[in-house]
C-alpha cells in the first residue's frame, strides 16, 4: 500500500464525475504530467460512474499503469497494488490468518483457564476460541485492504476518498487468482469464513475502491467471468501529436530542440522493418529525460550511440540499427512537418528557427543548436 499524503486534502474522482465535473478530473491528471487519450479517459469516467472495475489492455509502455498512478497522485488517493507474477497466492491478495498470533492467544488463555474454577473454564475457553477469529488476527492482502479502506472512507464521506486498487499485469495471475477476485469485483465484499461479522468491504457501487486492471495480453487469456466484471478499454500506441503532448507534459523543462530530437528519432526507429520489439511511449519519455539531463544541443553519431541503451534493448536490434545510423541522424535532424510545426505553434523561438532555416533542415551541420538559444 502507498498511503496518501495526510497533510493534503483528498479529492474523490468518482464524485467529480458523478457531479459532471469530468474536466476537473482531466486537468488533475494532466497536472501530474500524464495526458490521457480522450477515449480512454471517457471509458475511465464510465467505470467511475458505474462502480465497475476498469480493464485496460495494450502494449507495454503505453501508459496503462501510469494512468491510475496519475489519478492517485492528482487526487491524493491511497494506492493498493497487486502485481501479477507466477506463484501468486490468494492469501497474498485477499486475506490470511495470523496463525502464530492465534496459537499464542490460545496458549495464554489455556494457561489462564488452569487458574479458574472448573465451572468457569468451559465458557472462558469457548469465548477464547471464538475470539481467535476476530479482526485483530486477520492479515489483509492488497485487494482485501483496498476494499476495507473503501468501507472506512464511507464513515467520512466529505473528507475521505476510496483508494485506487491497481491489478497490474493481470494476464500473469492465473485462473485460481482470477476466480478468487470474482466475488469482490462483483459484490464489493470479501467473505471471510469464521470472521466475526463475516466479511470486509462495501457493497455500495459508489463507495467501492477504484479498481484498474491492466493486461499486456502476453501470458494467458483472461477468463470470461473475470472480464465481464469490468468496463474495457484498449490503449493503442498514441499518435505522434499525442506523443508530443505527453512528452511536453512529462518533461516541461526540455528544450524544443530536445523534444524534436526525441520525437523524430523514436518515430524513425518505429518505421524500420525487422525489429522484434519497437520502442514505446515509455522509451520516448526516458530518452527525452536523458536529453534534458545532459543538456543535449546536437545529435551526432557519438551522442546517438550513447543513448541507444534507452530504446534498443536486444543485441540483434542494436546491430540492425547501427546499420541505420545515417538514416536515423538524417531524420532526427531534418524538418518534420508534424513535429516542427507543432512545436512552432507553441514556441516563438522554434518558429523563428524554422523561418530562418527555410523550414527545412537538410544536414546535421545545419542543425547545431546552442543550449542558450532555448
What are these regions (language model features)?
Residues 1-374:
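C-terminal regulatory/interaction module of P-loop NTP-utilizing enzymes
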Amino acid at each position: 500500500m502507498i498511503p496518501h499524503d495526510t497533510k493534503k486534502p483528498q479529492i474523490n474522482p468518482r464524485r467529480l464525475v458523478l457531479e459532471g465535473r469530468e474536466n476537473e478530473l482531466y486537468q488533475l491528471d494532466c497536472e501530474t504530467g500524464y495526458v490521457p487519450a480522450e477515449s480512454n479517459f471517457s471509458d475511465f469516467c464510465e467505470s467511475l460512474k458505474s462502480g465497475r472495475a476498469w480493464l485496460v489492455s495494450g502494449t507495454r509502455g503505453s501508459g496503462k499503469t501510469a494512468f491510475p498512478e496519475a489519478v492517485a497522485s492528482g487526487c491524493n488517493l491511497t494506492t493498493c497494488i497487486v502485481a501479477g507474477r507466477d506463484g501468486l497466492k490468494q492469501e497474498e491478495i485477499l486475506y490470511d490468518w495470523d496463525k502464530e498470533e492465534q496459537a499464542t492467544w490460545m496458549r495464554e488463555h489455556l494457561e489462564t483457564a488452569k487458574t479458574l474454577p472448573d465451572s468457569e473454564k468451559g465458557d472462558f475457553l469457548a469465548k477464547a476460541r471464538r475470539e481467535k477469529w476476530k479482526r485483530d488476527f486477520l492479515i489483509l492482502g492488497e485487494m482485501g485492504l483496498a476494499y476495507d479502506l473503501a468501507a472506512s472512507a464511507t464513515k467520512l464521506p466529505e473528507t475521505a476518498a476510496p483508494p485506487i486498487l491497481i491489478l497490474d499485469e493481470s494476464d500473469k495471475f492465473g485462473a485460481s487468482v482470477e476466480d478468487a477476485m470474482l466475488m469482490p469485483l462483483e459484490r464489493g465484499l470479501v467473505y471471510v469464513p469464521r470472521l466475526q461479522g463475516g466479511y470486509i468491504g462495501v457493497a455500495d457501487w459508489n463507495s467501492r475502491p477504484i479498481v484498474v486492471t491492466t493486461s499486456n495480453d502476453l501470458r494467458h487469456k483472461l477468463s470470461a467471468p473475470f472480464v465481464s466484471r469490468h468496463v474495457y478499454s484498449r490503449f493503442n500506441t498514441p499518435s505522434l501529436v499525442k506523443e508530443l503532448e505527453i512528452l511536453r507534459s512529462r518533461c516541461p523543462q526540455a528544450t524544443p530542440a530536445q523534444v524534436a530530437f526525441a520525437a523524430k528519432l523514436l518515430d524513425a526507429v518505429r518505421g524500420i522493418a525487422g525489429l522484434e520489439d519497437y520502442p514505446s511511449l515509455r522509451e520516448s519519455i526516458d530518452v527525452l529525460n536523458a536529453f534534458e539531463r545532459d543538456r543535449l544541443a546536437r545529435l551526432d553519431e557519438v551522442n546517438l550511440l550513447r543513448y541507444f541503451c534507452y530504446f534498443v534493448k536486444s543485441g540483434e536490434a542494436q546491430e540492425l540499427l547501427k546499420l541505420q545510423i545515417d538514416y536515423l541522424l538524417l531524420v532526427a535532424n531534418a524538418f518534420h512537418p508534424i513535429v516542427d510545426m507543432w512545436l512552432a505553434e507553441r514556441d516563438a523561438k522554434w518558429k523563428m528557427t524554422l523561418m530562418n532555416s527555410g523550414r527545412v533542415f537538410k544536414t546535421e551541420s545545419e542543425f547545431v543548436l546552442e543550449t542558450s538559444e532555448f
